[in-house]
Amino acid sequence: MSAQKLNLEDVNASTKKYSRGRKLNPKKIKDKKLRSNIQKIEERIENVESSLAKTEILHEDNPGLLEAEGLERTYKFRQDQLAPNVALETATKSFSLDLDKFGGYSFDYTRDGRMILLGGRKGHISAFDWRTGKLLTELHLRETVRDVKWFHNHQYFAVAQKKYVYVYDNMGTEIHCLKRHIEVNALDFLPYHLLLTSIGNAGYLKYQDVSTGQLVAEHRTGMGASHVLHQNPHNAVEHVGHANGQVTLWSPSSTTPLVKMLTHRGPVRDLAVNRDGRYMVTAGADSLLKVWDLRTYKELHSYYTPTPAQRLTLSDRGLLAVGWGPHATIWKDALRTKQNFPYMNHLLPSSSVVDLHYCPYEDILGIGHAKGFESIIVPGSGEPNYDSYENDPFASRKQRQETEVRQLLEKLRPEMISLNADFIGNVDRAAPSLRKAEAEEEKPPEEKWVPKAKARGKNSALRRYLRKHARNVVDQRRLKVEKSLEIEKKMRAQRVRREQKLPEEREKWGYALSRFVSKK
């Protein structure tokens, strides 16, 4: 066979990896229509498994890692030593920006990793293509900037300024002012739900739908100001760190936290969740770095940092980056097992780390610090094989427009955010009688309305006729009946006055003419 053809043994081995479970035997089913449908479903599942296995074999790009020889340690390698030993294209992606006039820089990459957005503490905003150096926009707001965030593409971004959150386009034009988001410290964006989330000094977690402009939810955490807000990429649940050492998990449909975790004895400085949603890493003011299992909500192990860590971030391949003081330390395989030595270390002389983010699909770690921005090479951090249907770094303008339209059409509702991301499409296997009983318990009791006969005439034939027919329907017969009731009411009142020997009621002529009417 030709070397280009796929090895059947490799395909079979990979097919077992993507198996969807035990296959059904349709021969035992007597119903012909049901048997035919199950056969089609099984064939479809088999084709999917085979396609996934062949796609994995065709992946030519494999992630590379630093490998030490003998007594060498990978954390001793410096960036100036790595640059000559990597590809020229990768070496050009390592650069440094000296921006010491506008304070510490927070930043954000787009989902495809093409654009970067910088936000200086003193009001400097810059958006550009970091590969080519093409500048999109640059602003000087002359106002405090606490955080910046791209939306689902590079057309719009949000800036948390001194009082409100503002939305700009990629040309620097102010589009919206979100006055419901006051004194925000941290921003986050849920791309599949098109929700912008924020939390600030007031301690309110807010969800804003950027496609409709509607404020979806506003939850009071009750734990004071917070500046730690990160999402779980697996289920879109927001993780909020608080000053009392707790981490709370939130969804828009719940006014109370889904989960409360006491993670540290002091304030939570930052946290990060891996792509699978299984592990969470937290950094506290007690100089501890803890790894948590989100399936059991238990601590796995912890690390000690010489000074409290400022920032945490996890790459697509699971590399953990920790920013503490002037250092940025990268740990490999630090989630499942405790490591004795870090993978890499980078020093920022006479500066301090402000923000950390890995660039999607690249072996690049971005570091925002007090004197600017720096991009360093971290071999093995990026995912080499991307899904072009979801994020395509090389998409044309027309493809990006089609992707945006598809994202709007496939937008998920906020009610679909849950701790269990697989609950959609599941079959409720409870007995029908049990489901009916649960539905009746949840249904509010219906109170039957009974007319009260308080006085004479309240339950007459005309009244019973009006109650029997629809109350909101007005026809000629109803008007005639209501007029008859009004005349009957007046006659009854006059009869009562005559029995009590009271003078008949005269017409009310108003305030000006009432003094001329006899009061006898």
Curated annotation (Swiss-Prot):
SMART domains: BING4CT, WD40. Its main location: nucleus. WD repeats lie at residues 99-140, 142-179, 218-260, 263-302. It holds the Pfam family WD40. GO terms for cellular component: nucleolus; small-subunit processome; sno(s)RNA-containing ribonucleoprotein complex. PANTHER family: WD REPEAT-CONTAINING PROTEIN 46 (PTHR14085:SF3), WD-REPEAT PROTEIN BING4 (PTHR14085). This is Probable U3 small nucleolar RNA-associated protein 7. The gene is utp7.
